[in-house]
Design a protein with these regions (language model features):
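Hydrophobic cores of alpha-helical transmembrane segments in multi-pass inner/ER membrane proteins
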Residues: 25-37, 100-115, 181-199, 263-276
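Membrane-interface helix-loop-helix junctions at boundaries between adjacent transmembrane segments
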Residues: 86-181
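Alpha-helical transmembrane segments and their helix-start/interface "positive-inside/aromatic belt" motifs
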Residues: 14-22, 51-64, 120-141, 215-225, ...
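N-terminal signal-anchor module of multipass membrane proteins
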Residues: 1-58, 62-63, 67, 310-314
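Membrane-interface transmembrane-helix boundary segments in multi-pass integral membrane proteins
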Residues: 175-179, 249-266, 292-293, 312-315
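Membrane-interface helix-loop-helix modules in multi-pass inner-membrane proteins
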Residues: 64-130, 233-271
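Membrane-helix interface motif
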Residues: 75-85, 145-163, 236-247, 308-313
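Final/C-terminal transmembrane alpha-helix of multipass membrane proteins
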Residues: 290-311
Length: 315
C-alpha cells in the first residue's frame, strides 16, 4: 500500500488532507451539537412549538453517530500512533487523557439522548443534563486540540528551555493565535452545518410533516450563517493584518493579494448559501446549496489545522 501511494503522490496528498478535514469537521460538529440541541429545547418551550424539540432530538441522534465514530476512530489512530512513541512518554499520557475525556463526552451525550422520552415530563432536568453534556464536550474539544497542537509541534526544532505551556500559549499576530479565535464559532457553525444536511436525509425516516422541516431547516441554516459570518470576519481581519505590513513596505506581491482575495471570497460562499436557505419559504429545495455549504465549511478545517500546528516562539 505504501509503495502504491509513493507512486501516486496526488492520491497521497488527497488522503492526507482528508485525514485532517474529516475528523476535525466531525469533532467540531459533535462537540458543539449539545449547545444546539439545548437551544432547540429551550426555544421550543419558550415558543410552545414542538418543532424545535423534535429537531433537537434529531440532532442529538446525529451526535451519537459522530461521537461513537470519533471515539472508535480515535482509538484505532492512537494504537498506531503510540507505537512510534517511546513507552512512558508524557505524550502517551496526554493522548490517553484526551481520548478518555472525549469518551466521557460521548457517554454523556448518549445518556442525554436515551433519556429524552423518559425525562419528557421534566424538561428542566433534561435541559440541565444537556448543559452538562455541552460543557463536557467543550472540555473534550479543547483537550483534543491541545493534543493535536502538541503532537504537531513536538517534532519541530524547539529551544531546550521551551515548556509545554509555551507550546500552547498563543503569540499575538501568529496563525496559531488566529486559529484559536476561530474555535468557539466553528463549534457553533459546524453542528448546524451538519444538522441542515442531516435533517434533509431524515426527511423520509422522520415524517414530521413539511411544516416541521420548513421551520427547523431555516433555523439551523440561520444558526450556521450567523456563526460562520463571525468566522469569515475573523478571516478577513487576519488577512488584512497579514497584508498591511507588506502593503506599507511596498513588498506586496500580486500573487499574495490574489490568494488572500480568493481565500476570503471562497469562505464567504457558505454565508450566502445559508442566508438564502434561512430566508427561503421552501428550504427543502436547497439540498444542493446546503450540501455545498457543508463541504466548504469542512474544507476550512485544513487551513485551521495548519494554523493550529504552526509554531512561533514566544518573544
Amino acid at each position: 500500500m505504501q509503495a502504491f501511494l509513493a507512486d501516486n503522490p496526488v492520491l497521497q496528498n488527497i488522503l492526507d488532507m482528508a485525514a485532517i478535514i474529516i475528523p476535525l469537521s466531525m469533532l467540531f460538529a459533535f462537540c458543539g451539537i449539545c449547545i444546539l440541541t439545548v437551544s432547540g429545547e429551550i426555544l421550543g418551550m419558550r415558543r410552545r412549538r414542538s418543532f424545535y424539540g423534535k429537531c433537537a432530538m434529531q440532532l442529538s441522534m446525529l451526535g451519537q453517530g459522530l461521537g461513537w465514530t470519533l471515539l472508535v476512530g480515535g482509538r484505532v489512530w492512537l494504537y498506531f500512533l503510540e507505537q512510534d512513541i517511546p513507552s512512558g512518554s508524557i505524550l502517551i499520557m496526554f493522548h490517553e487523557i484526551s481520548w478518555m475525556v472525549l469518551g466521557l463526552s460521548v457517554i454523556f451525550s448518549c445518556i442525554y439522548f436515551l433519556l429524552w422520552k423518559t425525562l419528557a415530563p421534566y424538561p428542566g432536568i433534561h435541559i440541565g443534563l444537556g448543559v452538562i453534556c455541552a460543557l463536557q464536550s467543550v472540555l473534550a474539544l479543547l483537550l483534543v486540540l491541545a493534543c493535536l497542537r502538541t503532537l504537531a509541534v513536538v517534532n519541530l526544532p524547539l529551544a531546550e528551555e521551551t515548556t509545554p505551556l509555551q507550546v500552547l500559549m498563543p503569540v499575538w499576530g501568529t496563525e496559531y493565535a488566529t486559529s484559536l479565535c476561530y474555535i468557539p464559532f466553528l463549534m457553533l457553525a459546524m453542528p448546524a452545518a451538519f444538522g441542515c444536511v442531516w435533517l434533509l436525509l431524515r426527511r423520509q425516516k422522520d415524517d414530521f410533516g413539511r411544516d416541521h422541516y420548513n421551520t427547523v431547516i431555516p433555523w439551523c441554516a440561520a444558526w450556521a450563517r450567523n456563526a460562520w459570518a463571525i468566522v469569515w470576519l475573523l478571516l478577513l481581519a487576519a488577512s488584512v493584518l497579514e497584508l498591511s505590513p507588506l502593503l506599507q513596505g511596498g513588498t506586496l506581491e500580486t500573487a499574495d493579494a490574489v490568494t488572500a482575495g480568493i481565500r476570503v471570497l471562497l469562505w464567504l460562499i457558505p454565508v450566502l448559501l445559508w442566508f438564502m436557505a434561512a430566508r427561503s419559504a421552501t428550504p427543502l429545495r436547497h439540498k444542493a446549496s446546503l450540501t455545498v455549504s457543508l463541504v466548504l465549511s469542512c474544507l476550512f478545517m485544513l487551513p485551521f489545522f495548519m494554523g493550529l500546528s504552526s509554531w512561533a516562539p514566544l518573544p
